[in-house]
Structure formats: structure tokens, C-alpha cells
Amino acid sequence: MDVPKPLPSSLSSFAAPGDVMVRPLLLKPQWMNGLSERLLVSHYVNNYGGALRRLNAIRKRLAGLDWARAPAFEINGLKREELIAASSVILHEIYFDSLGGKGDSPPTGREEPPAELARALERDFGSVAAWRAEFTAIAKALAGGSGWAILAWSARLGRLVNQWAADHAHGLAAATPILALDMYEHAYHLDFGAKAAAYVDQAMGNLNWERIGARYRSAIGEQSEDKLFLPYGSPAQEEARISPEELKAALADAGDRRPVLLDVCLPKDLARRTDMLPGATVRAPGALARWVDDLPRGRPIAVYCICGFQVSGKTVTELRQRGYDAKAVSGGITAWHAIGGATVPLELSTYEDLAQVR
């Protein structure tokens, strides 16, 4: 059997020195039914981003530890916190990946599991409806406390299992999560207050079954579609994308290889914005022909929008067709926020379609 190709994930960063890299949002927050953009962005930036930043800080502490002399309490404390932070990062990535309907359009609430996964759910739970009833009951039972409801593949048990987890590090040994529902209060309080059950019902109507199915195929050793794990509209070519971490390092260069920053955003989306990356120029993507000749030919160009979807992707494609060294910032300014990147107040004086901003 061929070795399955791993899904694109910040998990790969664990095998290399340095920071674990942020994973872009694959959903459009404003498209979710019954889950507000404010809730989802706050959850991603503050809770997922906070866990990611905490994990990287812990890893730096561990890298400098003198293992021969470090006291047991320090080793225990750091390794415990590393486990909690790493598990939080991974479960949050699976959670956000699992939401978003079909990805290229708002969820309808009528999406169904792909055939292979549906057959597995029927085999292991009797029916898709029976699985859903059990999974949602587990999630709702966690209301008022904290934890995760997880659907995981266990090779040892030879089946899919619904898992109750009281915290980030509470998991079935050697099982591979394919769906995770965050039941910590931060996942729902802004929209639902204490009504956790209402949040569960709304979240279950926003699932992206294509990506959940891809995780299942990867877990059982089959190939998965990598394109499902890129933000919709993001350039497929790796050389046309730059991570927020790579951009942060590149911006530290004071020379002629320092990227030119372009903030491209539709007028209707700018109305929701308050900040931008330092040194960026805000341009209207629909007016590219009017400003493209102002760009320097000898400098790399980093293009970002809110979440790194088709607005920045289309702009980068057009710039590269015109011979510019342009790259889309994966995850947009939302992922930049999640890594704690600096911003300044939004300045719209250069925006060509300012009259359309509402």
C-alpha cells in the first residue's frame, strides 16, 4: 500500500525546528448560518491564535532547557503545558476546517457526508442519523463546562468512535480525529450566552463534509485532496503563497527584497475593517488596471485581504501574469492577527473605490 500523503497542516512544523505555523481559516466567517463573524474571528484570533503563540513560547523555553540540570517540577510543568497547548492548536484547526458548508458558497444546512464516510457511519453507528444523535448528545452534555466532542478513527478498534473529551489533552490513544466540536464557553458565549445546545445545533448545520471526508480517507490510509485544505480561491501553486510567519521575517529586511504590501479588499468588506499591516497600501482589486503600473518591478509583492480567499488570490494571479513577483498572504490579515502581527489604523486615502465603501 502506498504511504498516504499527509494533509497540509501546521503539524508538519513539529518535525522541524522553529515555530509551529498558523493555519489559515478555510471558511468565510460572514457566510456561516447562525454563527456570527464576530464570534468566529474572535475564536480564531484570540483562542486558536493564543494557543499557537503559547505553544511556540513553550517550545522556545524547552529548546533552551538544560535537561541534565533542570528540576523535575520545571520539566513536568513545561511538558504538561506543551501537551495542552499543542492539542489545543490541533483540535482548533480540525474544528475550523470542519466548518464552512461546501467552502465555495454559504452552507445550506442540508449538506451530507460523502458516500464512503456515510457508509462508515452506517456501519459503526447504524445510520448517519444515529451517529448525529449520539454526537450532538455528547456535545450538549458538555454544556456548562468545557471540552470537545470528537469523531475519530481508531485503527485498534477498527471503527469510528464518538469521543467525549473534558479538555484539550483528553483523547483516545492512537485515534485520529476527523471532526472536532469545541465546547469551551469561548466557542459560543458571544452569540448564545449560556445556551450551548443552541450553538451545537447551529454548528452541526455548518459542517464541511468534503473536508471531514478527506480527513477520514487520510486516516484510513487513502489519498486525500490537498486542494480542500487551501482557502477557497487561494493560489494552488505553493510559490504564489507566503505564510504570515514568512512575511513577518521578510518584513524585517530593510533592503530591496523587503516586500511591498498590498491590502486588497472589496468595498463591502472594507466597512468591517479597522486596521492594516504597517506600510501597506490599500488598493481596490477591481481597479487593478489603474494602479498596477505604480508597482516596482524589482521587489516582491505580498498581497492580503481579510482571510486570504479569492480576492487576494485573483489579484496575485493577475499580477503574476503581468510579470510581478506577487504572493498571496495565506489566511490574510485574520491569520496575521492570530500570530500577533503588528497593525496600524486603516488608511483609505489610496483606495480607488472609496465612494462604494459602506
Task: Describe each PLM feature range.
Residues 2-229:
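Feature for soluble, non-membrane regions of globular proteins
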Residues 63, 194, 255-256, 341:
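Residue-level recognition of short, well-ordered coil/turn positions
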Residues 224-253, 259, 267-302, 307-358:
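Rhodanese-like catalytic fold shared by cysteine-dependent sulfurtransferases
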